[in-house]
């Protein structure tokens, strides 16, 4: 059942791995060159999040990034691509444990959206970030993988996070 992909490491970058752990679960991980406190801030402060979340190769503009990072708090990200209509992604934070763990719902697909869990484990001044995406069905994960909105995109996204964190130390 396991499907693994990995980006190749370069001198300044770490490897991003993606693994399908079950029919509904995708896990993406990467060691980021910075302490957990700073990496966590990059995930929870809109002014930092906007700098790395959207893969540059997509040509998307992040028009707005509203984040109320607390249990029960909501988030909403609005993207635009060229002349197309803006698209929104939104949900609710269900768990916030600085600087170790974030859990949120993805509600733009209705009640049966995916749930994202991100853990941050610091070791030696670097932080292992593990993002787990639990989809409502095998078909939903299959569709996400087919649209390349998961593992491939996360390689570039995590590279951008790594590059930003190095500047924040």
What is each of the regions a protein language model found here?
Residues 103-156:
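Beta-strand/loop substructures that line and gate deep hydrophobic ligand-binding cavities in soluble
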Residues 30, 64-67, 89-95, 106, ...:
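Hydrophobic/aromatic beta-strand elements that line small-molecule binding cavities or substrate pockets
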Residues 2-59:
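Hydrophobic ligand-binding cavity/cleft-lining segments
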Residues 39, 49, 75-77, 93, ...:
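Hydrophobic pocket/interface hotspot
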Residues 163-169:
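Generic C-terminal helix-cap and adjacent flexible tail
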Residues 84-89, 111-113:
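Short coil-to-beta-strand transition motifs
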Residues 27-28, 47-86, 169:
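Short beta-edge strand/loop motif at the mouth of beta-sheet-based domains
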Residues 36-37, 68-70, 94-100, 119-128:
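A short, structured loop/turn motif at beta-sheet edges
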